[in-house]
């Protein structure tokens, strides 16, 4: 049956999708920041672009791996003679639940707080650059001055 395989695969695929999306949005914000704020710098080469994409997927795969590793596919007895199949998280030393909590908190920081800060900073710098930008030839045009 596919139950045990999907028990490990589905949470991993979900986590991987979220993580690679978050990292990709952060990389896009950083690239836009670089292109607008430092527009005279050289372009990123194709090789570097592929390296960044590969790193985004690799880091995402690594960060999502605990979602596949720490799973348990088992029968749970609800009442005598009635069992259900369940796919649950099974962290080592689960009596205190510390590993699952640590993973969740680190995921919150790495996948929400840090990208939010980086993206906000990048777009704030872009906004500041564009707000203070004067187009060539428009410096003496009173219509464009604010």
From Swiss-Prot:
Keyword set, alphabetical order: Cell membrane, Disulfide bond, G-protein coupled receptor, Lipoprotein, Membrane, Palmitate, Receptor, Transducer, Transmembrane, Transmembrane helix
Cytoplasmic side: 30-49, 122-146
Membrane-related topology note: Multi-pass membrane protein
Sections of the chain in a coiled coil: none
A GO cellular component annotation in the UniProt record: plasma membrane
Name the record gives this protein: Neuropeptide Y receptor type 2
Family that this chain belongs to: Belongs to the G-protein coupled receptor 1 family.
Database matches in SUPFAM superfamilies: Family A G protein-coupled receptor-like (SSF81321)
Compartmental location: Cell membrane
Gene Ontology terms, MF aspect: neuropeptide Y receptor activity
Gene transcribed to yield this protein: NPY2R
S-S pairs: 7-87
Extracellular compartment residues: 1-8, 71-100
Protein function: Receptor for neuropeptide Y and peptide YY.
TM region(s), chain numbering: 9-29, 50-70, 101-121
């Amino acid at each position: 049956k596919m139950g045990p395989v999907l028990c490990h695969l589905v949470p991993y695929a979900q986590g991987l999708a979220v993580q690679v999306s978050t990292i990709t949005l952060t990389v896009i914000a950083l690239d836009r920041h670089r292109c607008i704020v430092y527009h005279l710098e050289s372009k990123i080469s194709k090789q570097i672009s592929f390296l960044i994409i590969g790193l985004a997927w690799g880091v995402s795969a690594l960060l999502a791996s605990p979602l596949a590793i720490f799973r348990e596919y088992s029968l749970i007895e609800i009442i005598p003679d009635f069992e259900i199949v369940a796919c649950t998280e099974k962290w080592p030393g689960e009596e205190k639940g510390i590993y699952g909590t640590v993973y969740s908190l680190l995921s919150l920081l790495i996948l929400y707080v840090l990208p939010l800060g980086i993206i906000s900073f990048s777009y704030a710098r872009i906004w500041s650059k564009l707000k203070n930008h004067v187009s060539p030839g428009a410096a003496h045009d009173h219509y464009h001055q604010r």
